[in-house]
Amino acid sequence: MVAIQAAEQGHVGLALLERSDGPQLRRLFFRLSAQTLYRRFHSPVLRPEQAQPQRLLDVDHHDREAVVAVVDREIVGVARYARRVGSDSAEIAIVVADDWQRQGLATRMLSALHDRAQSEGVRQFTMSMQADNRPVVQLFRRFYPEIAMTHSQGMLEAVVPVAR
């Protein structure tokens, strides 16, 4: 991990995910409840292999980036983007360990991810979330006040500019 905001003992820091962070990412998976996994992957995920951990570790810090929240060298949250091939648009996703939710980590990670995306030439984020996932809907509405969401079959879709 490459520190963005250093963490003091017992406090949360932010870092860029590295391919070598696989063991920590796998441990995060086992900290997530079935509901949190479903919210993140939009389908039931029972084993880490179903979440395609190698794909989740595939970061190049340009087209694919991930910011992690870290406490005592353990990952407790991940915010990532993946740029669409040949585009300046990237899809984003965020997950926070259940015991760390509602403490501002998603906001901090989204802010850092937004800054990274801006510096790498990403011009817009696309996102999909379950319509009843109120914490995530509220997060995006707070962070992107101009957000317009479309509703289809229980999902919300949105596109927001990265340049603010």
Regions found by a protein language model. Give the residues of each.
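Long, contiguous binding/interaction regions
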Residues: 1-164
